[in-house]
């Protein structure tokens, strides 16, 4: 038997009152202002061979004020071992769990059986869930929603990418941006500072520390501290020495397209906003997501995968297998791979003195015939859709 409880953001006494009210509505006998022990006794019931699972959602609200609930829960489970009850505590506040919870609960942490962080789902899972959508559409939607299946449920795969983005983010009744803003305000204390840094990084010309310093006016030391916090929350990552990117797709889209144009976003209709501020720049936005999808596939195939910067700001992957073989990987995206692309790759590899045993090209629209004749047998072409 599975029992669910979603904790509200209120005092411990109010939580006991509300949970007790829920239990009374289910026909249980419990006092109007029950203690935690009364609540747990009522939930677990009498001794039975039937196992029960209690799932408490948003459990961080139970602990941020004080740790009394956790103390009572641990004591109850130890004193009533005859009750077959498994308690699972869940929360979306992963940053608080990783950075603050242990210091908050102290030695009580030793009574927790384990921690499990649920990662975002890979692109391949999205393809399996939506097999009818084209590969191009899946890539463009994954670029915004990332690997969060809760957001995937909101998609209408029969509609275009533009129509989905307009409905989910740009219409007056769109709730997702406000949900994200609320989540950020709960995770980050000085939101004005963090918003400034995230907006700066989202403009991909300013991903370097010096560029952030020039644009924000914050000291390099201050920027470094806030970047460290953002990386701990897995919102930002260092992709190259001194170069940072927003790693959360949802937040990256918001700070790239919506945050810099607040007035127009709130004022204009969705389609007009898309045409003015998103359409022209969206392919560049998607290319970064495509690179991440390629990286995800490569990490499953090779021992090490490292992003390298070459001439003219071009980046490539250098992979090594378990035998030490070096493989250079270019990712052209959804366009046809040409002889010019291959020549640029060769020039870039020479500029950084990179000698490779093999070359892999990720492309979703094939390659020109002239290139096939020119490099016959030297290249391996792959698609993220396979």
What are these model-derived regions, one by one?
Residues 2-3, 12-30, 41-44:
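Conserved NTP-binding/hydrolysis module of P-loop NTPases
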Residues 112-138:
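Conserved small helical "lid"/interfacial subdomain of P-loop NTPases
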Residues 2, 101-120:
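A short helix-turn-beta junction within AAA+ P-loop NTPase domains corresponding to the substrate/partner-engaging
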């Amino acid at each position: 038997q599975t029992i669910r409880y979603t904790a509200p953001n209120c005092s411990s006494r109010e939580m006991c009152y509300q949970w007790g009210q829920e239990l009374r509505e289910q026909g249980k006998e419990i006092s109007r202002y029950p203690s935690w022990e009364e609540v747990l006794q009522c939930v677990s019931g009498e001794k039975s061979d039937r196992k029960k699972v209690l799932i408490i959602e948003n459990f961080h609200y139970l602990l941020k004020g004080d740790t009394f609930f956790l103390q009572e829960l641990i004591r109850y489970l130890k004193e009533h071992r005859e009750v077959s009850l498994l308690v699972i505590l869940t929360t979306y506040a992963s940053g608080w769990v990783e950075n603050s919870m242990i210091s908050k609960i102290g030695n009580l942490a030793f009574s927790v059986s384990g921690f499990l962080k649920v990662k975002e789902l890979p692109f391949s899972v999205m393809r399996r869930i939506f097999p009818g959508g084209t590969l191009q559409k899946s890539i463009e939607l994954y670029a915004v929603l990332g690997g969060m299946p809760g957001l995937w449920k909101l998609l209408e795969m029969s509609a275009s990418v533009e129509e989905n983005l307009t409905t989910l983010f740009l219409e007056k009744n769109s709730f997702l941006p406000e949900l994200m803003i609320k989540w950020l305000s709960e995770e980050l204390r000085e939101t004005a500072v963090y918003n400034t840094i995230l907006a700066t990084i989202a403009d991909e010309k300013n991903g370097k520390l010096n560029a952030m310093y020039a644009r924000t006016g914050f000291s390099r030391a201050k920027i470094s501290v806030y970047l460290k916090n953002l990386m701990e929350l897995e919102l930002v990552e260092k992709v190259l020495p001194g170069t940072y990117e927003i790693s959360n797709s949802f937040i990256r889209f918001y700070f790239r397209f919506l945050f810099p144009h607040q007035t127009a976003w709130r004022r204009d209709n969705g389609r007009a906003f898309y045409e003015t501020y998103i359409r022209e720049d969206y392919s560049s936005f998607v290319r970064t997501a495509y690179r991440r999808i390629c990286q995800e596939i490569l990490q499953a195939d090779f021992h090490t995968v490292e992003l390298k910067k070459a001439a003219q700001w071009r980046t490539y992957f250098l992979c090594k297998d378990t035998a030490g073989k070096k493989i250079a990987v270019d990712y052209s995206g959804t366009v046809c791979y040409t002889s010019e692309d291959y020549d640029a790759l060769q020039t870039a590899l020479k500029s950084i003195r990179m000698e490779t045993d093999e070359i892999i090209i990720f492309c979703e629209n094939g390659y020109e015939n002239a290139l096939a004749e020119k490099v016959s047998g030297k290249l391996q072409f792959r698609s993220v859709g396979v």
